[in-house]
């Protein structure tokens, strides 16, 4: 493993990241490049994001994420989620807001006739979405892109239970301070997905600045497990990196059962 102290602000992922870590492009709003934001700061916390710079105007929009999922409309016409994840090495970054795993090209998510490329996945503690007003201790987001204005993010909840073997591998490589390094060990991401892929679906946004409203959200109904020790280990590195619940503002939450 080789450390690369190359810092990238996680907030700007919405604008453009290519699916290959060797050709990764990040487009940052020019007036927001050096803007610092936090989850709970009195000057740069969540309620101030929209005012930190003009490029963050979507943070005050009407289709923001996360939401509390309370009731949904079954929709039999919704296409299922077809995951085609390859074994991959990852570039791992602790950017102070989350721990992000940028994946090699080759892993895809197909929804109907559209195929999205997996860009990266990252963690939030506690979960960002709620289900019937209840939080989970962890939520992982798999970020996929079809175009700069068309993202599909799959949210997966962790619940306390049996030890998760794949999560143990990730924990062993979590950077405890800001920085980026490459993990050359190939991993199969299928271990971070439940067997049953039933989901909730709604239209929303990125949950961090610039809060771009370009995301098709698919929150899986079924959780994966991690031991209490594993969850505590993650929280010892990074916790409370979650956005508050946003208003639904007339949006409809659909669901599909497998």
Region locations from a protein language model:
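Alpha-carbonic anhydrase
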Residues: 3-5, 21-258
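C-terminal motif of bacterial Sec signal peptides marking the signal peptidase cleavage site
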Residues: 16-19
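Sec-dependent N-terminal signal peptides
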Residues: 5-14
């Amino acid at each position: 493993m080789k450390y690369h102290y190359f810092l990238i602000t996680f907030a700007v992922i919405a604008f453009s990241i290519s699916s290959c870590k060797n050709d990764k492009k990040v487009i940052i709003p020019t007036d927001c490049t050096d803007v610092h934001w936090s989850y709970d700061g009195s000057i740069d916390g969540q309620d101030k994001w929209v005012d930190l710079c003009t490029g963050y105007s979507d943070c005050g929009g009407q289709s923001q994420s996360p939401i509390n999922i309370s009731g949904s409309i079954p929709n039999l016409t919704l296409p299922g989620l077809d995951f085609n994840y390859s074994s991959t090495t990852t570039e791992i970054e602790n950017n102070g807001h989350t721990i992000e795993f940028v994946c090699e090209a080759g892993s895809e998510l197909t929804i109907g006739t559209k195929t999205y490329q997996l860009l990266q996945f990252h963690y939030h503690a506690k979960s960002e979405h709620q289900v019937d007003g209840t939080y989970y201790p962890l939520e992982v987001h798999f970020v996929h892109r079809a175009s700069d204005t068309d993202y599909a993010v799959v949210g997966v909840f962790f619940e306390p239970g049996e030890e998760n073997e794949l999560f143990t591998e990730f924990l062993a490589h979590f950077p405890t301070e800001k920085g980026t390094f490459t993990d050359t060990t190939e991993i199969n991401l299928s271990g971070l997905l439940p067997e049953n892929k039933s989901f909730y679906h709604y239209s929303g946004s990125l949950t961090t600045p610039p809060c771009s409203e370009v995301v098709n959200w698919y929150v899986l109904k079924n959780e994966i497990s991690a031991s209490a020790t594993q969850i505590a280990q993650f929280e010892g590195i990074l916790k409370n990196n979650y956005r508050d619940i946003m208003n639904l503002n007339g949006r409809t939450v659909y669901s599909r059962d497998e």
